[in-house]
Amino acid sequence: MKDQRESIRGIVDAVFCSGPTFSAGRLVTPEGGEVKFAGKVYVREHDAVRLEGRWVTHSKYGRQFEAEFLGHDLELDPEGLANFLANHPDIKGIGPAKARLIADRFGGDFDAAIRNDPESVAAVAKVPVETIGELRGIWIANRDFNHAMSHLAAYGLTHHQVTTLVGKFGSQVVATLERDPYVLMREIPGFGFKRVDKIARKMGTPKDLASRIRAGIQYCVLSALDDGDCWVEYEDLLDRANTLLVMDTLDSREVIERHLEALIAEGVLVSQALERLIVADPEIHRMETELAAIFRESGRRGPHAVADLDALLDVEGGELTPEQRGAVSNALIFSISLMTGGAGSGKTYAVSTIVSIADRLERKVLLAAPTGKAAKRLEDVVGHEASTIHRLLGFNGHTYARDSMNPIEADILVIDEVSMVDVPLAWRLFQAVDLTKTAVVLVGDHNQLPPVGPGNLLRDLVKSRVVPTTILTRIIRQAGVLKENSTAILAGEVRPTADVQEGARRPWYVIDRFSDREDVRRMLLLLFEEVLQERLGYDLLRDVQVLTPTHKGPLGTAELNIALQRLLQKKLRGFDVPDVPSGHRPAFYAGDKVIQTRNDYELGVMNGAVGYVVEATAKGALTVEFDGAVVEVEPGSDAASRLQLAYACSVHKVQGSEFPCAIVVAHKSHSFMHHRNLLYTAVTRAQESVILLGDRWGIENCAAKRQVDRRNTFLSFLLEPEARA
């Protein structure tokens, strides 16, 4: 039962767990009492804080304070001030003795002294003015935070979000947001229109505020990019914005159109007449237009001769099929060529042959892929060093070392997993290639899911044939049951559990007798509890990956990750994971499997990289191993917010990765997301075994449902034959 809202003050003397959105610890009050607390706040040991919230009785941890608001308590008596100065983790050069001198001399006048006469504080403490300058910055920042938090907590902003805003706007944060809350969308990553609009409504911002209408229009365009589209039809954009903004006026659509025309006139958005009038982000429009010009120009160039090419193909590629031979030949004689094919069609062997012939010709070959996992797999199977595209371009998190003025130095550049390459990355890549000196070979599987980002590069190129294109259609004899059954999905067929068996394992399992979602969930947990390791010999963390189409619901990634974390921590480490409060992110513990959700160039960890927590401290600091590289993640940092549990992942998130065993959840409750390219992409993540788990109708419907993923792209128009003429 919850009590009335109260406020408590004190010093944090212990932190049990801490993250950007949740902390638990122990507070020592000015009277010397100890209080256990937990809530949506971020604290560190020795912080002087004021917590607001309610007393609750937890079923496991007993009576504790549920914190809903945190302020840095700077209204300190001399004892508290000395403790704050001596123990604050960011204050350097002031130990207990110097802190006591400052507290005894200034007491309640410290705020005025540190703001207006910091030299006097330096003189009393006998420390350099630079040290007091750093202290002054921390003190004022905490004051600014308190001022901002006291105003903004009522609007639902968290401690972590307010900290970010104070760092951006300082003491003007409240005035800035009250004047125009939509500035959050422009200045702070992660603040989308809907979140900001909720804040604006609480502030009483009028619905017809110009910045709101403009922000809503831009949000609709950016939402299209998030869906993979590069443009929105003009009339459709007006309808979307009108539905989003709900302005409650008869002429709302006309008002929105006036603001849209203004955004176009200012160059904030761009419009173009295709089959219909469309609107787009100008950067994406420019990138696709320039890419189209690059591909068209390349397509106009004829082949260049390679001496004794047929003989080289006979020697190095004696086992090539005619299709593969054509792809290898194209790679060696054209400035841009494309090879695409499904699982088991022989793309890897063709790439290996390209590398072998290039070595004979003393040509420098570079291999790259969108993700670290895909690059490592390419390197392992081809036997030639490979890197991520970002590393190839020399990206340091801010700038690219390779561009048109400093192009990539290679004779042949092979890019694998091109289905994952979105328009911005493709544009960056071709900006860094001199096609008069370097041939680019694009390799992928056009039946896989398109990229997470905007565009549909691989399919647009396959459809247009603007560059020499080879589609490998023949499944090679050595492909095996797993790849044959995976390819059958493209024809709408789900084959039953395989008869063939290697040791205790089969390459293909279909478990389709569960119509109830909870039964599917129980079966999944049973596989981890009793089958995968004990009977099939798999490492439960490193060999097995659960794939599911959704994030929400009993069979979504969020709930499955919590359940699998609890099961595997108990099974493998004997650790009982505490309950995860509703609405909170689960904490990480040593042994957890995690995935990076956004690129982190400072740590050198890319989106989609799977890692393992080596160590997790009580304060929330993590040591994580990614493919042999160990990184340190501080609690409450942006790096920490980019990590998620990875026992279960969406299919898109692991595109380009492979695992010995993939468990693919396909249930009728997900039917609105089902289509055969999704299922095909999921099963082709497996190297040895696939386990299809769900109900028969759900699995078969997923394979039967054809979804033409026609994205709105400029390339699809610009590369049409008439556009190339």
Model regions: which residues?
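Conserved helicase motor core of P-loop NTPases
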Residues: 327, 446-603, 614, 724-725
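Short basic/glycine-enriched coil/helix segment immediately N-terminal to the Walker B
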Residues: 400-411, 431-437, 541, 654
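Walker B catalytic acidic pair
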Residues: 417, 444
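C-terminal accessory regions
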Residues: 596-597, 609-725
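ASCE P-loop NTPase motor cores of helicases and related translocases
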Residues: 226, 231, 239, 243-247, ...
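Conserved ATPase-coupling elements of RecA-like P-loop NTPase cores
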Residues: 418-429, 449-456, 674
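Loop/turn-to-beta-strand initiation segments
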Residues: 364, 409-412, 437-441, 689
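Accessory, non-ATPase domains that flank or precede helicase/AAA+ motor cores in DNA-metabolism machines
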Residues: 1-304
